[in-house]
């Protein structure tokens, strides 16, 4: 997005408070850069471990671009709440039974944060915080400033969840797998109760927390969305009308990273599993749009037998691939033993790379050799694929990912399903076992990747492969235009700043 210099008299001080999870941190750091490029001061409030994940990119933004982004770190009182030592992120939480304790511990950040804000020469103007951090609503009231909610979801999924919660159609079906239409949607969308986000699942010790989240969101000034209006026509307007609040589309926020170093480091936890050189050498050696990138997200906890089916499918497909493996430590040990015993990496050498841990996802997706993305349908991954024109194989796991799959496959027509029908929620991995077999993996890969750019008649309108790739390339162009000067998202950022200024003038 274009930088703008605003007068010091009108400089705003945005306080960004992301949830302590990788998928929530990454877009909030991008938003901090977008706001700072408009001449504003930005303070990111987080914990020491989480701050280390984006230290490099924020340091570059300060030193090389002169952006005024400050990072304030407060430790979580993990001992007080019976959490494991240094447990500062949802990624490292060993059990969902500790989820309530984690939220209670995070709640304790309110007091030291408010003391810090009281001491600032330039007082806070606006809080942008994750929907889960309901206590930030109290802070906003205390400082008499607006609070804006960040969900990390697209408007399609936000509207779907809102309308299901409002009308409760999921309660009228006879079974958890019976599909029902979601009311109030621009397209006819059907989903099963089992596929709904976890917020619709009963969790006795979290129900009051969820209610506080909903209540604090109802008091918010508005909602900021990492998407762009051209991607979700009809859904943007319908969602704003449904919640009767301001909604600002400021994405795709990942496009604020225009340096290769930022693309490589984006979201890194410091445990680099592959070097930039090794990754680029592999991609540079492949034909355009021939490589399948495979990553099921930072919270993937699939069992070894399921991951083995995925690996065997990748091998049998015959396509070049980069396979990122993330799972629980005990599962990783077992899977690593299988990889060594079966000599898997040697069998696919020259055609496939296995990355055990963090990978430079944005850099890989942006490379011209990447032609497909097997994804869990998390929104960050989905919109990054759209930005770089990479069609998807959808393998949703939990949260709103089945809704995102509907958008990808049924509305936008830029992906194919691997065929998973039920979620793998935290703690259910062993009970559910293997849900996707090798043949389904191979079939989905062939549907997405079999015809590459050198063997397709681009004038064949009846070819689904051509239509899918043409459509996502069109969306990639729209995404880049949205964040350019006078683009829809760039304009939305300016409107957001003006709206906050006007809100402050009313106090």
Swiss-Prot record:
Pfam families: UDPGT (PF00201). Keywords: Glycosyltransferase, Transferase. It is an enzyme of class 2 (transferase). UDP-alpha-D-glucose binds at residues 298, 359-361, 376-384, 398-401. Its EC number is 2.4.1.-. The keyword Iron-sulfur does not apply. InterPro entries: UDP_glucos_trans, UDP_glycos_trans_CS. Belongs to the UDP-glycosyltransferase family. This is UDP-glycosyltransferase 73D1. It comes from Arabidopsis thaliana (Mouse-ear cress). The gene is UGT73D1.
């Amino acid at each position: 997005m274009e930088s703008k210099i605003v007068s010091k008299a009108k400089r705003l001080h945005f306080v960004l408070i992301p949830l302590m999870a990788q998928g929530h941190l990454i877009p909030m750091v991008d938003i901090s850069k977008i706001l700072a490029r408009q001449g504003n001061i930005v303070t990111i409030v987080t914990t020491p471990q989480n701050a280390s994940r984006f230290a490099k990119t924020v340091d570059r933004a300060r030193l090389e671009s002169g952006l005024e982004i400050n990072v304030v770190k407060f430790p979580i009182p993990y001992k007080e709440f019976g959490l494991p030592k240094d447990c500062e992120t949802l990624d490292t939480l060993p059990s969902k039974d500790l989820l309530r304790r984690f939220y209670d511990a995070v709640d304790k950040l309110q007091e030291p944060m408010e003391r810090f804000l009281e001491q600032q020469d330039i007082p806070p103007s606006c809080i942008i915080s994750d929907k889960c951090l309901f206590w930030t609503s109290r802070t906003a009231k205390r400082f008499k400033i607006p609070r804006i909610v960040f969900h990390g979801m697209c408007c399609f999924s936000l509207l779907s969840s809102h309308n299901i919660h409002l009308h409760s159609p999921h309660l009228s079906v006879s079974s958890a797998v019976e599909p029902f239409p979601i009311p109030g949607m621009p397209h006819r969308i059907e989903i099963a109760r089992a596929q709904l986000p976890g917020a619709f699942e009963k969790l006795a010790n979290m129900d009051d927390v969820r209610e506080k989240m909903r209540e604090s969101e109802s008091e918010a000034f508005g909602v900021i969305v990492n998407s762009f209006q051209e991607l979700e026509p009809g859904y943007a307007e319908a969602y704003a009308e449904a919640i009767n609040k301001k909604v600002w589309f400021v994405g795709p926020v990942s496009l604020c990273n225009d340096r290769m170093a930022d693309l490589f480091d984006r979201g890194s936890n410091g445990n680099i599993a592959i070097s930039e050189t090794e990754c680029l050498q592999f991609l540079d050696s492949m034909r355009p749009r021939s490589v399948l990138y495979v990553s099921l997200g930072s919270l993937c906890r699939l069992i070894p037998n399921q991951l083995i089916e995925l690996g065997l499918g990748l091998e049998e497909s015959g396509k070049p691939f980069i396979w990122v493996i993330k799972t629980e430590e005990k599962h990783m040990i077992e899977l690593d033993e299988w990889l060594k015993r079966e000599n898997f990496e040697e069998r696919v050498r020259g055609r496939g790379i296995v990355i055990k841990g963090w990978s430079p996802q944005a850099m890989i997706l942006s490379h011209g050799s990447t032609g497909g993305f097997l994804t869990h349908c998390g929104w960050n991954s989905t919109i990054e694929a759209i930005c770089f024109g990479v069609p998807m194989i959808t393998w949703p796991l939990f949260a709103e990912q089945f809704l995102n799959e509907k958008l990808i496959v049924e509305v936008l027509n830029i992906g194919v399903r691997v065929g998973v029908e039920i979620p793998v929620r935290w703690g259910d991995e062993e009970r559910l076992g293997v849900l996707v077999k090798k043949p389904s993996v191979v079939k989905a890969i062939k549907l997405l990747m079999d015809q590459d750019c050198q063997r397709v008649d681009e004038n064949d309108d009846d070819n689904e492969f051509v239509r899918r790739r043409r459509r996502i390339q069109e969306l990639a162009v729209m995404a880049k235009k949205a964040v350019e000067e006078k683009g829809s998202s760039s304009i939305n950022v300016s409107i957001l700043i003006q709206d906050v200024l006007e809100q402050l003038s009313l106090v």
